[in-house]
């Protein structure tokens, strides 16, 4: 799961790998975990073993060979479980970029379903961690290790359940396909290749992404909500550069490059892009309103009914950064450089502007608006990262009802909320290629446990096993 963005798909070419999986058995599993530290039932022990093995691989951008080995290890487990060699394939769309695709063959009466995860992680500095980041720890009811949350638990949800269902002899009414990428945190080359050049390996009615959505606890441990990601904002980055002749600092000029750039930054900081809602964000506002105080809930419902309600939009935007990011496109300065000596006038100054653009909004319109804001200043605008447009995925009633039923069966009266994420995942490549994607990680966590990319990344032991069991049920439910 990228918190800070993705890179281009310009180099999406090369060889591929495919793994295909089939599932079966009508019985519904129990979510019971006797104790986070007791001996586990066989299927839960399998999940823990896979997670431990995965965390042991330092599958970072600096260690692509470790990413390859992690994918090979999962391929070996699947083949040992009975998947034919031709249905478990490793791919390398470009040098240092690896993936795995698995096909679980079914009766093939319906279009296949696709399940997504990524095996790569961001770098971790061992000295800063309380536990070795690349060795699975288990303490105080948590699994600790780099990638436990993002996204090796997701890989485990898929691989362990494919193995379990294969051994149980269950055959679905359609093929089930797993596509596991090894570069989601950096370039997204593998997912882009799967969605385009390798489309025949992953073509499906829709995809379920383990790297988005999930359950949310309150600070006191009550289950608050279950999120389904249906869309993502477009990630786009610009550089604004002011230049002039420079000179000696004892002879100031009115066209100082840093001063010009500061004016541009100030104008952009004072600008709000318009509120634009889509079906996902309208439903998100309506369904999540009950989780907020009455005044906020009223504003949420009012805005869902009328996106031109500027008063409601302003109250929500100023009270919560998450609301502001959900309602509108945002463009903010993230990096700054300029000048070459303390006693010299700067010849140039540059600011990096990172934009998160609402689905359905054209990136060129945002660039034109930035140009309008700084039009009278001598500043160049350059795109340094060209994002990939990814529209919202329509959410069929039957799919939503299936997820709601599973959530209620296992966790009771928990509101299910379709949502738009402000970050980026592999899902954007599939949406862009025409495959609907729904983020359903099913992992519950407290705000204090959101440590992806950070120190002492962790997930609850019970929450992990419950999410794997939920996926077991979901695979069987959706494949019929």
List PLM regions with ranges:
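Bacterial N-terminal signal peptides
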Residues: 14-27
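Sec/Tat signal peptide C-region and signal peptidase I cleavage site
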Residues: 28-32
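Histidine/acidic-residue-rich, glycine-tolerant segments that coordinate divalent metal ions
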Residues: 173-256
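A short core secondary-structure module
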Residues: 193-194, 250-274
């Amino acid at each position: 799961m990228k918190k800070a963005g993705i890179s281009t798909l310009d180099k999406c070419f090369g060889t591929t790998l495919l793994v295909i999986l089939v599932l079966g058995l009508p019985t519904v599993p129990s979510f019971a975990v006797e104790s986070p530290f007791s001996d586990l039932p066989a299927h839960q022990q399998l999940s823990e073993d896979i997670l431990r093995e995965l965390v042991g691989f330092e599958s970072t951008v600096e260690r692509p060979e470790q990413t390859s080995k992690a994918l090979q290890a999962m391929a070996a487990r699947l083949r040992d479980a009975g998947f034919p060699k031709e249905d478990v394939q490793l791919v390398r769309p470009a040098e240092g970029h690896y993936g795995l695709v698995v096909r679980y063959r079914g009766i093939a009466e319906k279009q296949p379903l696709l399940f997504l995860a990524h095996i790569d992680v961001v770098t971790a500095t061992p000295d800063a961690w309380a536990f070795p980041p690349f060795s699975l720890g288990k303490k105080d009811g948590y699994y600790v290790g780099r990638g436990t949350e993002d996204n090796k638990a997701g890989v485990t949800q898929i691989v362990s359940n494919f193995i379990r269902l294969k051994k149980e002899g269950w055959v679905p009414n359609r093929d089930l396909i797993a596509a596991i990428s090894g570069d989601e945190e950096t370039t997204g080359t593998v997912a882009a290749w799967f969605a385009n050049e390798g489309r025949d390996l992953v073509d499906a009615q829709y995809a379920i992404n383990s790297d988005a959505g999930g359950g949310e606890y309150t600070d006191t441990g009550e289950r608050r909500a279950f999120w389904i990601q249906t869309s993502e904002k477009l990630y786009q980055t610009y550089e604004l550069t002011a230049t002039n002749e420079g000179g000696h600092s004892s002879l100031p000029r009115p066209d100082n490059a840093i001063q010009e750039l500061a004016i541009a930054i100030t104008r952009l900081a004072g600008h709000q892009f318009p509120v634009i809602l889509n079906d996902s964000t309208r439903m998100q506002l309506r369904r999540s309103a009950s989780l907020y105080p009455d005044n906020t809930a009223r504003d949420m419902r009012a805005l869902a009914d009328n996106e031109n309600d500027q008063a409601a939009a302003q109250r929500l935007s100023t009270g919560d950064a998450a609301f502001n990011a959900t309602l509108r496109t945002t463009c903010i300065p993230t990096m700054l450089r300029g000048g070459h000596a303390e006693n010299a006038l700067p010849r140039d100054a540059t600011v990096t502007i990172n934009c998160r653009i609402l689905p359905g909004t054209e990136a060129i319109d945002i660039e034109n608006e930035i140009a309008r804001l700084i039009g009278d200043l001598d500043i160049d605008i350059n795109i340094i990262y060209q994002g990939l447009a990814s529209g919202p995925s329509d959410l069929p009633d039957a799919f939503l009802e299936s997820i709601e039923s599973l959530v209620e069966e296992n966790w009771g009266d928990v509101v299910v909320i379709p949502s738009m994420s402000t970050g980026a995942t592999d899902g954007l490549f599939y949406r862009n290629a025409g495959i609907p994607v729904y983020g359903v990680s099913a992992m519950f966590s407290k705000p204090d446990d959101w440590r992806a990319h950070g120190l002492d990344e962790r997930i609850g032991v019970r929450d992990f096993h419950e999410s794997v069991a939920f996926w077991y049920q979901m695979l069987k439910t959706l494949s019929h």
